[in-house]
Amino acid sequence: MELDEESFLDELMSLRRDGSAPWQAPPYPGGGGGGGGGGMMMSDLLFYGGDGGSAEARGGMDASPFQELASMAAPPPQHPHEEFNFDCLSEVCNPYRSCGAQLVPSEAASQTQTQLTPLRDAMVAEEETSGDKALLHGGGGSSSPTFMFGGGAGESSEMMAGIRGVGGGVHPRSKLHGTPSKNLMAERRRRKRLNDRLSMLRSIVPKISKMDRTSILGDTIDYVKELTERIKTLEEEIGVTPEELDLLNTMKDSSSGNNNEMLVRNSTKFDVENRGSGNTRIEICCPANPGVLLSTVSALEVLGLEIEQCVVSCFSDFGMQASCLQEDGKRQVVSTDEIKQTLFRSAGYGGRCL
């Protein structure tokens, strides 16, 4: 015989209509009555109907009808942590509904994981899709929320760690780490180049009214126009065309080479001055040939002249100014012309110095 809610209530109401003596039994210990003489209420019957130790708790009440109902019902729950189930749509608690098959916590955790696996896969796929879209559009790090689902303690922590790992692995370099983007670095380099060129332009143009970019560019344009007008004015004053100016520049460049050769030839100089008492002043200017200084000093030693003071320059040409004194025991008379010819030959020139 199976009992459901309706048959159970009908059986209880039929017993109440009979008005038998057991309904007036003494109250159970710890009853709700203040004076201890009240009868058993319907709530007491419902909550104590499935208790294994109800005979002692009711204090000797004749419970033969209830024992029959308890014998026909299923045994009480085996786990002490399980409680009675309540139906939110029912007015009466059914203590026997919880006596059915219950799931062990490990089985419940595995069932929860099985149910949440499709949802987690869907979330991972959606996260990857959103990450790809963000990379295509140049977005930053992912801002998707992290959810934690119910179930076993170990399963929930593993699932939460897995979801966080998926969410954080799409964009390893986020804006939270302070790493600037490539567009920002390129913009900074562009602005730096622009500022450097504006500073260079500002240093070239003599007339700058203000220091902002617009004024610098405007003053530069006006200065270029002014230079163009000045060039036209000078061309009109000279009376030559630009083609003629180019021809003149070409002729000037070709003639400059000959002038340089003439300057080199005319720059050779050998001066010897006798100041008396064996003191001689020498001044030499010639092209800087290799070994010209050593050959000049050797020639002066051969002539018996001792250098007391000397200044040598080798920038473009070889130049030497020296003050010499006649050595003791040498020839007493050495003419200036002889000194000049000796220095001329020591510098690498043949013939005589005119």
Swiss-Prot record:
<dbReference type="GO" id="GO:0005737">
    <property type="term" value="C:cytoplasm"/>
</dbReference>
<keyword id="KW-0539">Nucleus</keyword>
<dbReference type="GO" id="GO:0046983">
    <property type="term" value="F:protein dimerization activity"/>
</dbReference>
<feature type="region of interest" description="Helix-loop-helix motif">
    <location>
        <begin position="192"/>
        <end position="227"/>
    </location>
</feature>
<comment type="similarity">
    <text>Belongs to the bHLH protein family.</text>
</comment>
<dbReference type="GO" id="GO:0005634">
    <property type="term" value="C:nucleus"/>
</dbReference>
<protein>
    <recommendedName>
        <fullName>Transcription factor BHLH3</fullName>
    </recommendedName>
</protein>
<feature type="region of interest" description="Basic motif">
    <location>
        <begin position="178"/>
        <end position="191"/>
    </location>
</feature>
<feature type="region of interest" description="Disordered">
    <location>
        <begin position="124"/>
        <end position="143"/>
    </location>
</feature>
<dbReference type="GO" id="GO:0006355">
    <property type="term" value="P:regulation of DNA-templated transcription"/>
</dbReference>
<keyword id="KW-0238">DNA-binding</keyword>
<keyword id="KW-0611">Plant defense</keyword>
<feature type="domain" description="bHLH">
    <location>
        <begin position="178"/>
        <end position="227"/>
    </location>
</feature>
<dbReference type="GO" id="GO:0031347">
    <property type="term" value="P:regulation of defense response"/>
</dbReference>
<dbReference type="InterPro" id="IPR054502">
    <property type="entry name" value="bHLH-TF_ACT-like_plant"/>
</dbReference>
<keyword id="KW-0804">Transcription</keyword>
<dbReference type="InterPro" id="IPR036638">
    <property type="entry name" value="HLH_DNA-bd_sf"/>
</dbReference>
<dbReference type="GO" id="GO:0006952">
    <property type="term" value="P:defense response"/>
</dbReference>
<dbReference type="Pfam" id="PF22754">
    <property type="entry name" value="bHLH-TF_ACT-like_plant"/>
</dbReference>
<keyword id="KW-0963">Cytoplasm</keyword>
<dbReference type="GO" id="GO:0043565">
    <property type="term" value="F:sequence-specific DNA binding"/>
</dbReference>
<dbReference type="Pfam" id="PF00010">
    <property type="entry name" value="HLH"/>
</dbReference>
<dbReference type="GO" id="GO:0003700">
    <property type="term" value="F:DNA-binding transcription factor activity"/>
</dbReference>
<dbReference type="InterPro" id="IPR011598">
    <property type="entry name" value="bHLH_dom"/>
</dbReference>
<dbReference type="InterPro" id="IPR051358">
    <property type="entry name" value="TF_AMS/ICE1/BHLH6-like"/>
</dbReference>
<keyword id="KW-0805">Transcription regulation</keyword>
<comment type="function">
    <text>Transcription factor involved in defense responses that functions downstream of RAC1 and upstream of PAL1 and WRKY19 genes.</text>
</comment>
<comment type="subunit">
    <text>Interacts with LAX1.</text>
</comment>
